[in-house]
Amino acid sequence: MRSNMIKKGIDRAPHRSLLRAAGVKEEDMDKPFIGVCNSYIDIIPGHMHLNKFAEVAKEAIIEAGGIPFEFNTIGVDDGIAMGHIGMRYSLPSREIICDAAETVINAHWFDGVFYIPNCDKITPGMLMAAVRTNVPAVFVSGGPMEAGRTKEGKSLSLVSVFEGVGAFSSGKMTREELLEIEQLACPTCGSCSGMFTANSMNSLMEMLGLALPGNGTLVATSTERHNLIKDAAKHLINLIEKDIRPRDIVTEETIDDAFALDMAMGGSTNTVLHTLAIANEAEIDYDLTRINEVAERVPYLCKISPASDYSMDDVHKAGGVAAIMKELIEMGAVKGDRITITGKSLYENVAHAQITNTDVIRTKETAYSPVGGLSILYGNLAPDGAVIKVGAVDPSIKTFTGEAIVFNSQEEAQEQINNGAVKEGQVVVIRYEGPKGGPGMPEMLAPTSAIQGRGLGTKVALITDGRFSGASRGISIGHISPEAAEGGPIAFVENGDMIKIDLIERTIEWEISEEELAKRREGWTEPEPKVKKGYLARYSKLVTSANTGGVMKI
């Protein structure tokens, strides 16, 4: 066992003395030491209940024959951090979470790790740590929030509140109506109830083979999640005994299949960023162009908020992620013979699943679209790629051409959108918000929600080198690479330039001559860093572009 490094031999007597002080008994020294990597945090609704999950996990690990040691990571609530300096810390927190987990796991030579994530950057941060350390691991997330309901029974989520702000500012909603939505949208603990980033990643974990069926859709308040925890603990001990590690499970083919599920469910654009980062930690050289290849063979089967009024709970009641996975395997879009944490194949894990509501989960024959819900766009404005959640764009929109209205920060854009400066037919360009330029690649939920709330969702496009919340919808193109801070083409766009977006051909083109572009390049100088000390200053110097997952390189 790995843990023998700290508990066996005469020279480890001091180590054992400290372990005894921590409650380890003599008879425990021959048992596997299990790290319980938790992320309990009071201020994050998706994590406020995870202390209870950890207690269930520790009891289950002891019962299964292991010795648990709980430790915690940091976390950022993206909704609370949205629209101000706090959002610049969101994506960078992913790297801290990964590094922190690696530090505790390797410093103490755990034999296995039981990860308990839930929200946006915590889940990918822990997944990155799992494949980086390559110690036997299982995941059980905190689960999605129950959907809110108006007094009339209409489904609500956090995006309802963000879009309500835009509706109020444009006179389409009263203060009292907005207050009602604010009070009803988020009724329980758990990750936000739609197919936003947290639930996208927690669903993808089922396809990755690192979490059990039900992980992505069982609501946080369900006692069935405790059964997932107990089962996962037993599987973890088995993984340790058989020496099955995360990199045995997560392969290049696994990454393809994760994107296949993403396409079928119209997941958050952030999944592209995070899954590429996970591949990087697993030492898989994954080409961004493969994502469009996956999209071509995977139909769009399941529209969830913000693309519809369905919540994750609705998906669970309709058969869950397992039913979608089974459909994808049986149509040949996903390989069903891959190994998973259960010791069984992917198909064996989901063979029991059935689609019970074809309004929520469609079949191949009745799919919303024959191609997946995410696209990578290329063109002279994004030579290294950009991402759009086509599943959250009005189906009638195939192309969009408009004049650029350019902003050098999200705050500037937000102010002008609220003031009515953005008009129908324009392409809002928000730049210097990439991984380096932000720094931290902040999400643009406030601007996209303001556009939707003002009734411009099908009449205005928004492009950025920043990123979007999973709750964003409309013609919202993010991750434009190279970013403006690196001298990417988006740095040279000016007001009035024509930009054409083609969702069928997956292109984003900017009307400019080579001569004019060269002239604009000559007058450009790299901007001063917005942050000159602290973690964000270090992050901006080390982080890579979005097309490689926004990972840090030494």
Curated annotation (Swiss-Prot):
<keyword id="KW-0479">Metal-binding</keyword>
<feature type="binding site">
    <location>
        <position position="78"/>
    </location>
    <ligand>
        <name>Mg(2+)</name>
    </ligand>
</feature>
<feature type="modified residue" description="N6-carboxylysine">
    <location>
        <position position="121"/>
    </location>
</feature>
<feature type="binding site">
    <location>
        <position position="120"/>
    </location>
    <ligand>
        <name>Mg(2+)</name>
    </ligand>
</feature>
<comment type="function">
    <text>Functions in the biosynthesis of branched-chain amino acids. Catalyzes the dehydration of (2R,3R)-2,3-dihydroxy-3-methylpentanoate (2,3-dihydroxy-3-methylvalerate) into 2-oxo-3-methylpentanoate (2-oxo-3-methylvalerate) and of (2R)-2,3-dihydroxy-3-methylbutanoate (2,3-dihydroxyisovalerate) into 2-oxo-3-methylbutanoate (2-oxoisovalerate), the penultimate precursor to L-isoleucine and L-valine, respectively.</text>
</comment>
<feature type="binding site" description="via carbamate group">
    <location>
        <position position="121"/>
    </location>
    <ligand>
        <name>Mg(2+)</name>
    </ligand>
</feature>
<dbReference type="Pfam" id="PF24877">
    <property type="entry name" value="ILV_EDD_C"/>
</dbReference>
<dbReference type="GO" id="GO:0004160">
    <property type="term" value="F:dihydroxy-acid dehydratase activity"/>
</dbReference>
<dbReference type="GO" id="GO:0000287">
    <property type="term" value="F:magnesium ion binding"/>
</dbReference>
<keyword id="KW-0408">Iron</keyword>
<dbReference type="InterPro" id="IPR020558">
    <property type="entry name" value="DiOHA_6PGluconate_deHydtase_CS"/>
</dbReference>
<keyword id="KW-0456">Lyase</keyword>
<feature type="binding site">
    <location>
        <position position="119"/>
    </location>
    <ligand>
        <name>[2Fe-2S] cluster</name>
    </ligand>
</feature>
<dbReference type="InterPro" id="IPR042096">
    <property type="entry name" value="Dihydro-acid_dehy_C"/>
</dbReference>
<comment type="pathway">
    <text>Amino-acid biosynthesis; L-isoleucine biosynthesis; L-isoleucine from 2-oxobutanoate: step 3/4.</text>
</comment>
<feature type="binding site">
    <location>
        <position position="443"/>
    </location>
    <ligand>
        <name>Mg(2+)</name>
    </ligand>
</feature>
<dbReference type="InterPro" id="IPR056740">
    <property type="entry name" value="ILV_EDD_C"/>
</dbReference>
<keyword id="KW-0100">Branched-chain amino acid biosynthesis</keyword>
<protein>
    <recommendedName>
        <fullName>Dihydroxy-acid dehydratase</fullName>
        <ecNumber>4.2.1.9</ecNumber>
    </recommendedName>
</protein>
<feature type="active site" description="Proton acceptor">
    <location>
        <position position="469"/>
    </location>
</feature>
<comment type="pathway">
    <text>Amino-acid biosynthesis; L-valine biosynthesis; L-valine from pyruvate: step 3/4.</text>
</comment>
<dbReference type="InterPro" id="IPR004404">
    <property type="entry name" value="DihydroxyA_deHydtase"/>
</dbReference>
<feature type="binding site">
    <location>
        <position position="192"/>
    </location>
    <ligand>
        <name>[2Fe-2S] cluster</name>
    </ligand>
</feature>
<dbReference type="Pfam" id="PF00920">
    <property type="entry name" value="ILVD_EDD_N"/>
</dbReference>
<dbReference type="InterPro" id="IPR000581">
    <property type="entry name" value="ILV_EDD_N"/>
</dbReference>
<dbReference type="GO" id="GO:0009097">
    <property type="term" value="P:isoleucine biosynthetic process"/>
</dbReference>
<dbReference type="GO" id="GO:0005829">
    <property type="term" value="C:cytosol"/>
</dbReference>
<dbReference type="GO" id="GO:0009099">
    <property type="term" value="P:L-valine biosynthetic process"/>
</dbReference>
<comment type="similarity">
    <text>Belongs to the IlvD/Edd family.</text>
</comment>
<dbReference type="InterPro" id="IPR037237">
    <property type="entry name" value="IlvD/EDD_N"/>
</dbReference>
<comment type="subunit">
    <text>Homodimer.</text>
</comment>
<keyword id="KW-0411">Iron-sulfur</keyword>
<dbReference type="GO" id="GO:0051537">
    <property type="term" value="F:2 iron, 2 sulfur cluster binding"/>
</dbReference>
<keyword id="KW-0001">2Fe-2S</keyword>
<keyword id="KW-0028">Amino-acid biosynthesis</keyword>
<keyword id="KW-0460">Magnesium</keyword>
